[in-house]
Design a protein with these regions (language model features):
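Non-catalytic terminal extensions that flank enzyme cores
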Residues: 1-143
């Protein structure tokens, strides 16, 4: 799981529900923009909540899984990477909040990855409700 910006909610939902040890190999949160840039690079447009950023995150995280968990040692294991980059509603309630959520996953360990990418526009007017929505959405997407 890699969640940047205001979106550290999906991993929280998994940890809160229990059973995360059988699903989550790694949870990474980068709320700081400089730290995020150090991991994923700087986007040409200098924006963080974009489809391009999400796709870069997914590719990076899948590559890390494949580097760190050897296929020879786990020939039947299917891998996935979940990521989101989100901005929730601001304090002045001028910007309503939106984000990008995605998952790359295998349905067969010997084949490539499928991919789902979603763009969200939050309708809630409270940041906590937006975070809860994101956590539920991410959990259901992974399920």
């Amino acid at each position: 799981f890699a969640e940047i910006g205001a979106g550290q909610e999906t991993a929280r939902h998994f940890f809160r529900a229990g059973g995360a040890s059988g699903t989550i190999a790694k949870a990474m949160s980068a709320y700081d923009k400089d730290f995020s840039d150090a991991i994923y690079g700087i986007e040409d447009d200098k924006r963080y909540v974009t489809e391009a950023r999400l796709r870069k995150m997914l590719d990076h995280e899948v590559n890390l899984v494949e580097e760190r968990i050897l296929r020879e040692a786990h020939p039947h294991k299917m891998f996935f990477a979940y990521a989101n980059t989100v901005a929730t509603i601001d304090f002045a309630k001028k910007y309503k909040g939106h984000g990008w959520v995605g998952i790359k996953y295998q349905v067969d360990p010997d084949q490539g990855y499928n991919e789902i990418v979603l763009h969200l526009r939050f309708k809630e007017t409270d940041a906590r409700l937006q975070q809860e929505t994101l956590g539920v959405l991410g959990t259901n997407l992974i399920y």
